[in-house]
Amino acid sequence: MFSVESLERAELCESLLTWIQTFNVDAPCQTVEDLTNGVVMAQVLQKIDPAYFDENWLNRIKTEVGDNWRLKISNLKKILKGILDYNHEILGQQINDFTLPDVNLIGEHSDAAELGRMLQLILGCAVNCEQKQEYIQAIMMMEESVQHVVMTAIQELMSKESPVSAGNDAYVDLDRQLKKTTEELNEALSAKEEIAQRCHELDMQVAALQEEKSSLLAENQVLMERLNQSDSIEDPNSPAGRRHLQLQTQLEQLQEETFRLEAAKDDYRIRCEELEKEISELRQQNDELTTLADEAQSLKDEIDVLRHSSDKVSKLEGQVESYKKKLEDLGDLRRQVKLLEEKNTMYMQNTVSLEEELRKANAARSQLETYKRQVVELQNRLSEESKKADKLDFEYKRLKEKVDSLQKEKDRLRTERDSLKETIEELRCVQAQEGQLTTQGLMPLGSQESSDSLAAEIVTPEIREKLIRLQHENKMLKLNQEGSDNEKIALLQSLLDDANLRKNELETENRLVNQRLLEVQSQVEELQKSLQDQGSKAEDSVLLKKKLEEHLEKLHEANNELQKKRAIIEDLEPRFNNSSLKIEELQEALRKKEEEMKQMEERYKKYLEKAKSVIRTLDPKQNQGAAPEIQALKNQLQERDRLFHSLEKEYEKTKSQREMEEKYIVSAWYNMGMTLHKKAAEDRLASTGSGQSFLARQRQATSSRRSYPGHVQPATAR
């Protein structure tokens, strides 16, 4: 057997390049430079095992590398790592003594020898994957020289491989037996090729001899004709007789040679049949070993799964131990749960009572709405009365100022009157002038008396009665409000807001009244000026006095109403302030209670969830029904073990049954082939009668030999 070391690396690279072209990848792969970027090799690996070399792995290989040798080296490193991982993880093999390719030489210098080593690793992945029969068949269809180099590369690579798990003796023996069978198969194939070549040479010799025989027969016929025309051939002294004897001896020699070649041909045919049988047996053994290797791989996977499940079992046992330790704290948790349940019942009772109070508050809300409407109406009335009072107060002040100014005017007129009296006495004018002076002096006296009477008429009993009634209603409303503390908090708050709004409105109205007061004051000043201008006219002064009296009356009434309303407002303000403070205190207390309730509810929920989780994870032997998940897991483990044992038994049973069936099928097929072969030989011998000539028998033997491989091929392929 050859070794790759005896071959030229360039020849190996060229042969493997021819093998790579059978994959029909998208990237060009005609020369060594086409393979240095690694794209072709990555696509070939994806076709070999698409599940392992998936699209994500293929996307890591950069396609547009150009002449950048660093990117080429990066791609080749990724491919080499993927091949080694595939051999270790999927094929369960490890390459020990094989020289790994130098990716730097491949990427930078396009080294054919190192590229041949890389392609040899890819070849090893192809002949060891699940679709290896397809790739081996493709190799067998290639040229003989390329096939020989590829098989030699496979043998060298397989000699360098070793299983990953050294403890798996059955897998090692199976791999050794598979290699031995592969070597025997290669030897049988080479022997078959040699025998086929020898048969071909013999066929060529037989054909040449037959042609020579036909030429001799033709020549013999010509000679016979000439003999008939010439002397008798029986006379040995004649030239024809000598020629006849010479041809007869030559014919005997040729017949002996023909018999000898026929015997050798039969021997080679028998040897070829035996070798074909051996090849079929070796192929059957190879198929059986392949199935055994697949079964060994599946058993190895099952062993890994069982090892993983045993690790899970150990982890679960550790968890069970931890749960048993946690079970010791169950008593404290139960006491905490009882305390939490008691607190929960207390909180539930409080909640029920609060809900009852809430229903009562909802029932009293309609009554509070009516009270609110009444208070709004009273406030509207109060605002109207306060407007009137402010207006009258303003008019009173203006009129008072006017009265003061008129009083000053009156004093001035009195002084003038006194001075006029003195002048009258001194001059002693006529009686008519004296009468006019007396009438002019009496008019101011009458105005003084009227002003004194206006000052006395200030009492307003109707306004006083209204204020008393409003005070009584206000007291009743306050008593009703104090009777429903928590139920009327919202209503009192709304009343407080309304009162504040009303206060703002009154302030605005007060500003408007002040403006009106300024206007009235300006009017009074104008009246005073007009009075000074028209002091000599008696009628005008009478009208002004009447207007002044009317203004004074209105001013007194407004002043009285304003004083009463101020007294009412002063009485209401402390109560209103007290009620607002009480409302704020009650709201703050209610808010604190609600926050405490929420905190207690959240704390209770946390404790309850924690207790449930701890009880759920405890050992069911000490706390029945507290942790059904652990018992369910144990039951599942036991059921899985039982199922595993039953599957193992069933697998052994089906394995033995399948082996027996395969043996029966192989033996039946072999017996049927032998019977058919014997029957065909007997028919062929029976068809050859004694009356046939030697040449006819030779032609039948040649035709049967040519048709024989066609009959044997289906049996071997099958």
UniProtKB/Swiss-Prot annotation:
It is found in: Cytoplasm, Cytoskeleton; Golgi apparatus. The modification Phosphoserine is found at S3, S6, S238, S693, S707. The keyword NADP does not apply. Residues 696-707 have a biased composition (Low complexity). Residues 167-433, 462-667 form a coiled coil. Gene3D superfamilies: Calponin-like domain. Residues 553-718 are annotated as: Required for association with Golgi. Residues 682-718 are annotated as: Disordered. Acts as an adapter protein linking the dynein motor complex to various cargos and converts dynein from a non-processive to a highly processive motor in the presence of dynactin. Facilitates the interaction between dynein and dynactin and activates dynein processivity (the ability to move along a microtubule for a long distance without falling off the track). Predominantly recruits 2 dyneins, which increases both the force and speed of the microtubule motor. Component of the FTS/Hook/FHIP complex (FHF complex). This is Protein Hook homolog 3. It comes from Homo sapiens (Human).
